[in-house]
Amino acid sequence: MPVYAKAIFGSFPSVQQVRVENGERCLIEAMDELNKNEKGLYRPVRLENGDQISTTDDVLNGKLARVSYTPFEEFELVSNSKGSCMEYENQEQSSKIMEQMRILRQTEELCDVELLVAGSVIRAHRYILAAASPYFKAMFTNGMVEMKKLTIELQDIPEESVRIIVDYIYTDKIAITMNNVHQLIFTATVLQMDVIVVACQQFLATMITSHNCMSLYHFSDIYNCTNLISSIEDFASSQFRCIRKSPEFNSISFHHLKSLLNRSDLNVSEEQDVFETIVQWVSSNPRDRQHHFVQLFKTLRLHLVGWNFLCEAVNSNSYVKNSQECREIISAMVLDAMTPSKRKHPESNHENTSEYSASMACPSLTASSSSSTSTFRKSVAGAIFCAGGRGKAGGPFSSVEAYDWRRNQWIEVPDMMSQRRHVGVVSANGNLYAIGGHDGTAHLATAEAFQPSIRQWKRIASMKTARRGIAVASIENVIYAVGGLDDTTCYKTVERYDIEEDEWSTVADMDVQRGGVGVAVIGRYLFAIGGNDGTSSLETCERFDPMIDKWKRIASMKNRRAGSGVCVLDGYLYAIGGFDDNAPLETCERYDPDADKWITLDKMSSPRGGVGVAALGGKVYAIGGHDGSDYLNTVECYDPIANRWQPAAEIKECRAGAGVAWANVRMHQLSRTPEKCDSGCAPSGGSYCI
């Protein structure tokens, strides 16, 4: 039980109450009345025999007259509004304790274990080691002989790395360098110091090059460095066009090669690169690798391989000929190609158009094929272009941006020859076409074409009618320019551009005037969606059949829309955003041509009038626009499976009324400089600290 002692001093008594424990050393403050605000002395006293405290120390003005204790009851406390308990936390306490432990280790005080490593002794405190390392905890707590030994020998472990790790345990700091990272990963793995293993992987991830990529793969497998393997695969995928040609590439394991070839972001020039890589890898050691050929062949996305290559290279290859399963895969693909189906290709952006057919030399694999092999490679999936439009300053743009799906970023490409807002943009015959619009002074009939292979725009024949708010689409390398408006008229006229002849002609007018109309192609039909007739925004739609040169009404949308974005994905037509008669819209709809029916989709995160829309990679992208207050540079993409919009990489310019279209181009064609292998090397002697 606690005892409270009274200390009475000299002729000037000062009573101090001190809580002590029986037989426990304590401190009593001796203070005289005259100097109680100036001086204080602390003298050790001991409770003796349970009833008397004594000391021989002098205090202040005289000797201690007497010291006695009087046990008494503890005073009563009553709970108040602040509660009956106060929790106190000192967040600095643990760090102060570790600082003291570090000092104790430096001075070799209270050290109770010696680690003998390669003839060197490292002194430490076993409780600290056990708390930091599961390896040491097991050694010191599981009845092992080391529990009672002062000196413990660690065999076959580098002394330097053990010393670095023990220092880290006491200091929370470690310097990882090119010279010690291999030993640190090994030692940290033995000592089960996962945090150091992860840090070493992070350091090595910054050192990956096309030259050490394969050896790091092997190293990562040995130590099960899953984080590093992921970083290596990302690097190898982005640099695949380079590393597949290196002599070291053939050393890659089957498991890693298969994982790499399955990636949609694999950077290839053509899908043929994948087949050639498979053959190269198997042929480097056919006796041990030929049995892997079928599994690797299944990573090949046959719908991306040209017919000529399929027949001449793939079908004639000895590994393919000797595999019944490979032959069956090819036969199924050919049979599927001969059985047209409107919605076989979940990734199609321009189904059944000449541009799409040109980009997809083979139709898709059968529905029974794995999803990963029935999709595009991002590097050969084409690009979305965003051209012209206008921003806050009011003047139209001539600038053009292209979306790199693999890198999830927009890049600048050469400007158009003219500034154009509310311009029509479409891809056809390997080129990108910009048609009509307004240049800030006048409505335009002019048109121009961009050739990705030489990164240049050129003039083409002008339309018969100058107009903005025009929509364009292509069928069989023929471009149709639909509707639009000028300062006095909303048009229902439609012009047809013959790419071969570089000549415009007129076709049948639409039933309704449509300025700010959206158009898209499904099969052999051209669809005109919404727009404005000069009086109000429209919900009506119609379909054009070039074979008979006639328009036909189809089901109306659920919302009036002008300046909306329209595209096709998986055989469905999407109408996104736009303006009604009052404000920009965030609503979206999808049209099923088989059922002649519109359904409502998930709303975008923001209203977007004058939005540009295109499909890529199985998703619909809504680009820029105006939300009623501001011009936007934000981009959203719609996942039809999840019925959900998600943000995507932003365009560089805030713009509305831009022309947006998907085109079958390779991103490396659009770069100002040729794509090079990325060495990723860090400076010599580089280090990584945690």
From Swiss-Prot:
GO terms for cellular component: Cul3-RING ubiquitin ligase complex; cytoplasm; neuron projection; neuronal cell body; postsynaptic density. PROSITE patterns: BTB. Expressed in neurons. Component of the BCR(kel-8) E3 ubiquitin ligase complex, at least composed of cul-3, kel-8 and rbx-1. Interacts with rpy-1. Substrate-specific adapter of a BCR (BTB-CUL3-RBX1) E3 ubiquitin ligase complex that regulates degradation of glutamate receptors in neurons. The BCR(kel-8) ubiquitin ligase complex mediates ubiquitination and subsequent degradation of rpy-1. Indirectly regulates the protein turnover of glr-1, possibly via ubiquitination and degradation of rpy-1. One of its GO terms (molecular function) is ubiquitin-like ligase-substrate adaptor activity. The gene is kel-8. GO terms for biological process: proteasome-mediated ubiquitin-dependent protein catabolic process; protein ubiquitination; ubiquitin-dependent protein catabolic process. Its main location: other. It comes from Caenorhabditis elegans. It is found in: Synapse. Signal peptide: none annotated. Keywords: Kelch repeat, Repeat, Synapse, Ubl conjugation pathway. Residues 213-314 form the BACK domain. Residues 111-178 form the BTB domain. Pathway: Protein modification; protein ubiquitination. This is Kelch-like protein 8. Kelch repeats lie at residues 383-430, 431-477, 478-524, 525-571, 572-618, 620-665. Disulfide bonds: none annotated.
